Swiss-Prot record:
Entry EC number(s): 3.1.3.77
Reaction catalysed by this enzyme: 5-methylsulfanyl-2,3-dioxopentyl phosphate + H2O = 1,2-dihydroxy-5-(methylsulfanyl)pent-1-en-3-one + phosphate
Entry-linked CDD domains: HAD_EP
Main location: cytoplasm
GO cellular component: cytoplasm; nucleus
Cofactor info, note text: Binds 1 Mg(2+) ion per subunit.
UniProt signal peptide: none
Gene source species: Saccharomyces cerevisiae (strain RM11-1a)
Gene symbol of the encoding locus: UTR4
Positions that bind Mg(2+): 11, 13, 186
Species classification: Eukaryota, Fungi, Dikarya, Ascomycota, Saccharomycotina
Pathway stated in the Swiss-Prot or TrEMBL entry: Amino-acid biosynthesis; L-methionine biosynthesis via salvage pathway; L-methionine from S-methyl-5-thio-alpha-D-ribose 1-phosphate: step 3/6; Amino-acid biosynthesis; L-methionine biosynthesis via salvage pathway; L-methionine from S-methyl-5-thio-alpha-D-ribose 1-phosphate: step 4/6
Protein name: Enolase-phosphatase E1
InterPro entries attached to this UniProt entry: Enolase-ppase_E1, ENOPH1_eukaryotes, HAD-like_sf, HAD_sf
Gene3D superfamilies, A to Z: 1.10.720.60, HAD superfamily/HAD-like
Length: 227
């Protein structure tokens, strides 16, 4: 089913890892760190440049604004930078490991051209794939899949995932024809946007994913073993 494609573009949550990972692990880790991060911020702190881009001087208001963005799951590029900074600390300390599906790990390792497209920042994507829970090893062991991935795209590099132009931008950047690419995601709006430039699409149907109305109009993949 996937042998006709030379290039694969993958979404992350709900596609290569459980959709719950972001909301039940990454978001809570971030929101727990925000108060201390904001209150202890100084002009020479590493995160000061990111926080200053919100243009909110009052620390209480800034903290409330950041937490509101998270609660509403707003795809704000400044928020994504800040999340990447905080999550880096979690990954590097061993507190966070990404539960990438075993079939997705195998898929990424065996396919020649694999690219990632997520609303999370490129930095956050590289962290996630750099600290993957090894399904065949003790809990403290992790895998680094970044060497198997050919490139990363986010809303800053390419645009919103629900806009067709974003996929045209990606095709340009990877130097591929639309007919050569298969895009896999759990979001039908993203699939429709990619199809708008002729990219083949597949709906990822993983445990915990929300039901998709008219899901029968998409090629459905419950795992990547058939690709």
């Amino acid at each position: 089913m996937g042998d006709n494609y030379s290039t694969y573009l993958l979404d992350i949550e709900g596609t290569v890892c459980p959709i719950s990972f972001v909301k039940e692990t990454l978001f809570p880790y971030f929101t727990k760190k925000v108060p201390q991060l904001v209150q202890q911020d100084t002009r020479d702190s590493p995160v000061s440049n990111i926080l200053s881009q919100f243009h909110i001087d009052d620390k209480e208001q800034l903290q409330a604004h950041i937490l509101e963005l998270v609660a509403k799951d707003v795809k704000d590029p400044i928020l994504k930078q800040l999340q990447g900074y905080i999550w880096a600390q979690g990954y590097e300390s061993g507190q966070i490991k990404a539960p990438v599906y075993a079939d997705a790990i195998d898929f990424i390792k065996r396919k020649k051209r694999v690219f990632i497209y997520s609303s999370g920042s490129v930095k956050a994507q590289k962290l996630l794939f750099g600290y993957v829970q090894d399904p065949n090893a003790p809990a403290h062991d992790s895998l680094d899949l970044n060497s198997y991935i050919d490139g990363y795209f986010d809303i800053n590099t390419s645009g919103k995932k629900t806009e067709t132009q974003s996929y045209a931008n990606i095709l340009r950047d990877i130097g591929a024809k639309a007919s050569e690419v298969l895009f896999l995601s759990d979001n039908p709006l993203e699939l429709d946007a990619a199809a708008g430039v002729g990219i083949a699409t597949g709906l990822a149907s993983r445990p915990g994913n929300a039901p998709v109305p008219d899901g029968q109009k998409y090629q459905v993949y419950k795992d990547f073993e058939t690709l």
